[in-house]
């Protein structure tokens, strides 16, 4: 018998608890009246009984002295957060570089009746969770090559394959490691994932060939691959019956009447808002894994693949194997399926600036077998991209800054940090033009790879070792923004190259450094990189293992350096808020008739091409990260000498709206428009409108990287409509151009691989759009259908033809009579008196003279 001993105060307290409080919250019973009405329940079940009696209870739950089962009782953690084998595949020697060995929707594969976790998931509607995966391979010592395993939020879309290392990733090297583990948080535009009807996948695991598989004689031509996955931090919500459905401040309308500055945040920001109040939006990192991005160094500090070259057994000692210009714009990797120019993260960021400076860090990752042996020497020659280095011998190269790498052993990567050595404080981005002026240079020199010791190996293994080249930047400063889409570089003055990036302390830590100017003090010390900020001692040696995130975090310092000094700029041009606070072109449209409206959605999706999708800089920027939330500033420029009344309004996603991208009469009432919030204007009194679009959405965030899934909802910020009245034929053409910029309340979460160069689409020229019929030519006055019918009628009938011929005869008769009665002096030569030059039209956009 189980007896409990209580003191007098414990007994009294227990009695008071029964009198004054309810029973246990999990199993509750309360007698409410003398007619025995009771409310009972357990968890999410409640029962109201009108003729109830007390519960009959006998005995208490007992603990076994001798356990019948010694395993831990099952729970959500043991059942729902254990590893399950979700995929098996073979990596073959026939797989080319960047071949996708596996592309897995991890959550969909975990939702499987073969796995115990489905017993929990199928009875719930929504969930929040993280994902952890393991990828295992079993190579032999006679096999060499590498794979990259990257967890991509939603879909890879048009991101550069060479920049997959921007995502949470693991590198598999047959000579170094045979397993990688990746753990990711919940990243989604919505607060929870709907198991029965998902909007789009949460996480996609892609496994691609990073270095082709080579084998020795008699070795298997494949390596097997297994993928394990589990949920982490699993939260289940919405109990549901079992379903047979399977998983699927101040106000202003314009800056001045005809002048508006789009160049910087202070002048481009809107002070008028479509919001109900002059409200602010609070920060919320809960759906973005807490990874908020504010600076472009988030991308420039991550290793991304730029080039690959072989170290062959036929290479002689002192032979130059690879020559790499030292600038951040270089990349050589391409792919055919899908067709990509695989730009690196560093080149993608730096291509958008006029000037750069900083220390570039090259990572050389080798893929040998355990039976290969050899050494490489890496040498930096200061100068520019045009210097001739073909005559520099191995002995001469040891005079310059150099490092030697032994490819044999457990360390796979040489990290070579090139110090900033230049005759100018900055280098210029010359890829925007083809002409070259003496003194204008892009690179600070060249990096040369020499054969230091010949490659030796048994005859039954491959006679070469592949080397991947990555690049990053330390103390990087870029300034003076521009728009430019880089092509695959045959580097200026040389057709060989490659670059790499250093890895941060943790993968995907945003803003690992603030570049040359600190955020705390924009006028303070410059060029403070990770090593300077953290104050740590530089590690001895430049060799590391890039496959291991713990070892890859070493701060590179190959050679001793001085601190770079004080920046000449008081503003950090690499700040996202400064860069995108400048207004960038969004779209343009022209009205042809009176009492019409035009609606255009602001969609971030990269699957929508200009002119209906984001063009150029906006397209590039909104695909650099997974999630966006917060308001946007819209600047509308009005062109044409008109006196037209207009009204603009903003419609959040999900509500009634007129047909987008069509000039038409509005089907919406004035009550509906003004209830949404409208702005009235007159085009004679103002030439521009600057207005803030509020963050009004039922979503947590929107995304530009859904690749067609959820494009209509989860990638659209909202819709803007403009309606005009009192537009007549005395007015010139009426055109609107729209520009978009971010605000200080904008938030950007979770970095993505930048768009590959093939997906960078610019706005079409005005002439091409006029030729395509998208815009009306500004040369012709708008005419109604009635005018055109009248003109065609006149041309057909030719009225007064006979009368005009008769008048002509009489005038000729009178002229002849007048000549016969007068003696005229001899005619004088009037040189060029009535000569007329050819008529020409000068079109300013194309800078061409069209002569008629």
From Swiss-Prot:
SUPFAM superfamilies: Positive stranded ssRNA viruses. Viral protein genome-linked: VPg is uridylylated prior to priming replication into VPg-pUpU. Keywords: Capsid protein, Host endosome, Host membrane, Host-virus interaction, Ion channel, Ion transport, Membrane, T=pseudo3 icosahedral capsid protein, Transport, Viral attachment to host cell, Viral ion channel, Virion, Virus entry into host cell. It comes from the Viruses. The record marks 23-24, 245-246, 491-492, 765-766, 836-837 as: Cleavage. It holds the Pfam family Rhv. The keyword Chaperone does not apply. Disulfide bonds: none annotated. The keyword Transport applies. GO terms for molecular function: channel activity; structural molecule activity. A motif ((L)YPX(n)L motif) lies at residues 167-171, 200-205. The record marks 769 as: Important for VP1 folding and capsid assembly. One of its GO terms (biological process) is symbiont entry into host cell. Belongs to the picornaviridae polyprotein family. This is Genome polyprotein. It comes from Human hepatitis A virus genotype IA (isolate CR326). The lineage of its organism: Viruses, Riboviria, Orthornavirae, Pisuviricota, Pisoniviricetes.
């Amino acid at each position: 018998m189980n007896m409990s001993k209580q003191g007098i105060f414990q007994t009294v307290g227990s009695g008071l608890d029964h009198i004054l409080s309810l029973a246990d919250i999990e199993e509750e019973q309360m007698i409410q009246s003398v007619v025995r009405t009771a409310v009972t329940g357990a968890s999410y079940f409640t029962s109201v009984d009108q003729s109830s009696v007390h519960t009959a209870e006998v005995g208490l739950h007992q603990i076994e002295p001798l356990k019948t089962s010694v395993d831990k009782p099952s729970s959500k953690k043991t059942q729902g957060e254990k590893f399950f084998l979700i995929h098996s595949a073979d990596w073959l020697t026939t797989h080319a570089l960047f071949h996708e060995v596996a592309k897995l929707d991890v959550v969909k594969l975990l939702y499987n009746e073969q796995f115990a976790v489905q017993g929990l998931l199928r009875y719930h509607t929504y969930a929040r969770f993280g994902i952890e995966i393991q990828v295992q391979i079993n190579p032999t010592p006679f096999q060499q090559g590498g794979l990259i395993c990257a967890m991509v939020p939603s879909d890879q879309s048009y991101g550069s394959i060479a920049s997959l290392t921007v995502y949470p990733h693991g590198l598999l090297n047959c000579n170094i490691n045979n397993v990688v583990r990746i753990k990711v948080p919940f990243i989604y535009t919505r607060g929870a994932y709907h198991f029965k009807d998902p909007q789009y996948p949460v996480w996609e695991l892609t496994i691609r060939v990073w270095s082709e598989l080579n084998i020795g004689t008699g070795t298997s031509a494949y390596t097997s691959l297994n993928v394990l996955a589990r949920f982490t931090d699993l939260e289940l919500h919405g109990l549901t019956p079992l379903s047979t459905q399977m998983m699927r401040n101040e106000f202003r309308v314009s800056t001045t009447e005809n002048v508006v500055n789009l160049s910087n945040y202070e002048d481009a920001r809107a002070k008028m808002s479509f919001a109900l109040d002059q409200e602010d939006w609070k920060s919320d990192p809960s759906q973005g894994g807490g990874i908020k991005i504010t600076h472009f160094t988030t991308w420039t500090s991550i290793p991304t693949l730029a080039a690959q070259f072989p170290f062959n057994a036929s290479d002689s000692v002192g032979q130059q194997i690879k020559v790499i210009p030292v600038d951040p714009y270089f990349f050589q990797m391409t792919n055919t399926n899908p067709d990509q120019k695989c730009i690196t993260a560093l080149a993608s960021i730096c291509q958008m600036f006029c000037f750069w400076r900083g220390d570039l860090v090259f990572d050389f990752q080798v893929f040998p077998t355990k039976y290969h042996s050899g050494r490489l020497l890496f040498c930096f020659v200061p100068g520019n991209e045009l210097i001739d280095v073909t005559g520099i011998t191995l002995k001469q190269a040891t005079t310059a800054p150099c490092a030697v790498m032994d490819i044999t052993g457990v360390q796979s990567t040489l990290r070579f940090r090139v110090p900033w050595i230049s005759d100018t404080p900055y280098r210029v981005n010359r890829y925007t033009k083809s002409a070259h002026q003496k003194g204008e240079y892009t690179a600070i020199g060249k990096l040369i790879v020499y054969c230091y010791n010949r490659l030796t190996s048994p005859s039954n293994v491959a006679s070469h070792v592949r080397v991947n080249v990555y690049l990053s930047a330390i103390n990087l400063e870029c300034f003076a923004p521009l728009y430019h889409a880089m092509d695959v570089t045959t580097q200026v003055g040389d057709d060989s190259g490659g670059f790499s990036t250093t890895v941060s302390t943790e993968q995907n830590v945003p803003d690992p450094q603030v570049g040359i100017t600190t955020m705390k003090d924009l006028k303070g010390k410059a060029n403070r990189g990770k090593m300077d900020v953290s104050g740590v001692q530089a590690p001895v040696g430049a060799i590391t293992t890039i496959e291991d995130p713990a070892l890859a975090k070493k701060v590179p310092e190959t050679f001793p350096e001085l601190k770079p000094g004080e920046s000449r700029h008081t503003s950090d041009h690499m700040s996202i808020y400064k860069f995108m606070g400048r207004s960038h072109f969004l779209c343009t449209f022209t009205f042809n008739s009176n009492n019409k409206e035009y609606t255009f959605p602001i969609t971030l999706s990269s699957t929508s091409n200009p002119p209906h999708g984001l063009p150029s800089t906006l397209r590039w920027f909104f695909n650099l990260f997974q999630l966006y939330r917060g308001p946007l500033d819209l600047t509308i420029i009005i062109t044409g000498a008109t006196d037209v009344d207009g009204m603009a309004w903003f419609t959040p996603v999900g509500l009634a709206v007129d047909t987008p991208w069509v000039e038409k009469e509005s089907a919406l009432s004035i009550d509906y428009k003004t209830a949404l919030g409208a702005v009235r204007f007159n085009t004679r009194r103002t030439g521009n409108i600057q207005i803030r679009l509020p963050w009004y959405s039922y979503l947590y965030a929107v995304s530009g990287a859904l690749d067609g899934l959820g494009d209509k909802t989860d990638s659209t910020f909202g819709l803007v409509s403009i309606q005009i009245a009192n537009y007549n034929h005395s007015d010139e053409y009426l055109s609107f151009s729209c520009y978009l910029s971010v605000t200080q309340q904008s938030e950007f979460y979770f970095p993505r691989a930048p768009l590959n160069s093939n997906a960078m689409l610019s706005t079409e020229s005005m002439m091409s759009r006029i030729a395509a019929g998208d815009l009306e030519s500004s040369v012709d006055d708008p005419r109604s259908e009635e005018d055109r019918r009248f003109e065609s009628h006149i041309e057909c009938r030719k009225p007064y033809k006979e009368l005009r011929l008769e008048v002509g005869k009489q005038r000729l008769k009178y002229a002849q009579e007048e000549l016969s009665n007068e003696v005229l002096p001899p005619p004088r030569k009037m040189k060029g008196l009535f000569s007329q030059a050819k008529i020409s039209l000068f079109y300013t956009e194309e800078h061409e003279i069209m002569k008629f």
